[in-house]
Amino acid sequence: MIAHIQGKLVEKSPTEVVIDCNGVGYHVNISLHTYGLLPTTDFVKLFTHLIIKEDSHSLYGFAEKSEKEIFKLLISVSGIGANIARTMLSSIEPKQIINAIGSGDVGTIQSIKGIGVKTAQRTIIDLKEKVLKLYDLDQVSISQSNTNKDEALSALEVLGFIRKSAEKVVEKIVATMPDATVETIIKQALKNL
């Protein structure tokens, strides 16, 4: 219904912004990912998705069209509402969500606050085929990079690093070097931990 909004950025916080569009202030819910991509100038354009319920109209905004499309996929899953989808996009990068769904990585999806095992599994079951087709992902390369990532995380845990902090570093490495070997991931992680 409302494809995008552009105007003057009046207020911003990590979860919402107010955009003045010709004298009307629109309250738009955003993810942390979008918050990080907001321009430093006063003028902003967000791609939006309007959710109309019996008791409310909620507008969700995204800095990138791709994030909006992922949001729409996520809310199509039974048990995932707009707020949980926004939490998912705030917790991990949109590309990581796509890779986790495409590779069937229940652990990554489940690591998001508010997502249990059943919801993570349902998300993968409902969206895996769509994600593989829409994003033209090669299932073999995804599972290979996930295996390397998991092996590297296990090795870092054995070396005494806390899993959460190691996970963040390893995710960044895998995002920049998707074909990295286990050894390369560990070496790069040791430099950053």
UniProtKB/Swiss-Prot annotation:
**Compartments, record wording:** Cytoplasm
Residue ranges for the region (Flexible linker) are 143-145
Entry keyword set: Cytoplasm, DNA damage, DNA recombination, DNA repair, DNA-binding
- Show the segment(s) annotated as Domain II: 64-142
Cite the Pfam families for this sequence: HHH_5, RuvA_C, RuvA_N
Q: Where is this region: Domain I?
A: 1-63
Q: Which GO terms describe its biological process?
A: DNA recombination; DNA repair
Function (record text): The RuvA-RuvB-RuvC complex processes Holliday junction (HJ) DNA during genetic recombination and DNA repair, while the RuvA-RuvB complex plays an important role in the rescue of blocked DNA replication forks via replication fork reversal (RFR). RuvA specifically binds to HJ cruciform DNA, conferring on it an open structure. The RuvB hexamer acts as an ATP-dependent pump, pulling dsDNA into and through the RuvAB complex. HJ branch migration allows RuvC to scan DNA until it finds its consensus sequence, where it cleaves and resolves the cruciform DNA.
What the entry says about domains is:
Has three domains with a flexible linker between the domains II and III and assumes an 'L' shape. Domain III is highly mobile and contacts RuvB.
Q: What is this protein called?
A: Holliday junction branch migration complex subunit RuvA
- This chain's source organism reads Flavobacterium psychrophilum (strain ATCC 49511 / DSM 21280 / CIP 103535 / JIP02/86)
